[in-house]
Amino acid sequence: MPAESHTVYPAYRFSIAPMLDWTDRHCRYFLRLLSRNTLLYTEMVTTGAIIHGKGDYLAYSEEEHPVALQLGGSDPAALAQCAKLAEARGYDEINLNVGCPSDRVQNGMFGACLMGNAQLVADCVKAMRDVVSIPVTVKTRIGIDDQDSYEFLCDFINTVSGKGECEMFIIHARKAWLSGLSPKENREIPPLDYPRVYQLKRDFPHLTMSINGGIKSLEEAKAHLQHMDGVMVGREAYQNPGILAAVDREIFGSSDTDADPVAVVRAMYPYIERELSQGTYLGHITRHMLGLFQGIPGARQWRRYLSENAHKAGADINVLEHALKLVADKR
């Protein structure tokens, strides 16, 4: 497990994307044990859930820092209210979702469809910036539907950075189809256009920009960093979290030893014990840990044992200890 480390680089140099149903608080706690410096994002949380919901949608562990809250919404006043609450809770950044293409999100008038209304996005960002001192950022695509020209993208960035005073953008290097494709298909079918994102950074050198989409290794991340201020990794970091073990050293220049996956599992035990005592099921935590040993002998046995046993009544850390033994036996 990496120790607290110091780096000359900002946290946004390498971040984990907000992913619905994946980057919950259990996932983020686990990922933090693999990298001290990586910027973590929550799942998208709607303004309606925060303002009217019964649960605590802003809950997180102090150990997760640096951590950003991604908001979904299009009402400037509601977003400002939620941003203020998030800052009071200690979040390090507020991010506005202008990239998710799902029907559920569009029906709520937020996500990628907002890209067609740059002035509204600017109003939303400005409303949040006016009430918080932490960074307010925007995650978006390179276009939507047939509005996919470079001129359209530049106009969007111009408006949101100018009238909205947004200083940082995370650009998913694909356009989004607002109808006809599922969210999963929208992550795979529209072609990646990294050169367009690089060009955007060159044309807006005063803005901070991170690139997202299809990045599968630290080598690829380092190549993107030749052109961009930051790199955001999504599915690969979730499905193969072991790649984060070297992030502090390779991306942030830390002298710390890379995180050891077995040590990371055992470092989870106090957190797991605490969560189990509060009624959390073991499987709700371990589902995020299934890919930890990918590429290591015993990975399949690890995944299978956890998948078959972590959901059972009374499952506790003994399940993890047994799964670790299966990995050790294969080494």
Swiss-Prot record:
Pfam families: Dus (PF01207). Keywords: Flavoprotein, FMN, NADP, Oxidoreductase, RNA-binding, tRNA processing, tRNA-binding. The keyword Coiled coil does not apply. Its cofactor is FMN. GO terms for molecular function: flavin adenine dinucleotide binding; FMN binding; tRNA binding; tRNA-dihydrouridine20 synthase activity; tRNA-dihydrouridine20a synthase activity. Its EC number is 1.3.1.-, 1.3.1.91. The record marks 97, 184, 187, 300, 303 as: Interacts with tRNA. It catalyses: 5,6-dihydrouridine(20) in tRNA + NADP(+) = uridine(20) in tRNA + NADPH + H(+); 5,6-dihydrouridine(20) in tRNA + NAD(+) = uridine(20) in tRNA + NADH + H(+); 5,6-dihydrouridine(20a) in tRNA + NADP(+) = uridine(20a) in tRNA + NADPH + H(+); 5,6-dihydrouridine(20a) in tRNA + NAD(+) = uridine(20a) in tRNA + NADH + H(+). The active site is at residue 100. Transmembrane segments: none annotated. FMN binds at residues 18-20, 70, 139, 172, 212-214, 234-235. Belongs to the Dus family. DusA subfamily. Catalyzes the synthesis of 5,6-dihydrouridine (D), a modified base found in the D-loop of most tRNAs, via the reduction of the C5-C6 double bond in target uridines. Specifically modifies U20 and U20a in tRNAs. This is tRNA-dihydrouridine(20/20a) synthase. It comes from Escherichia coli O6:H1 (strain CFT073 / ATCC 700928 / UPEC).
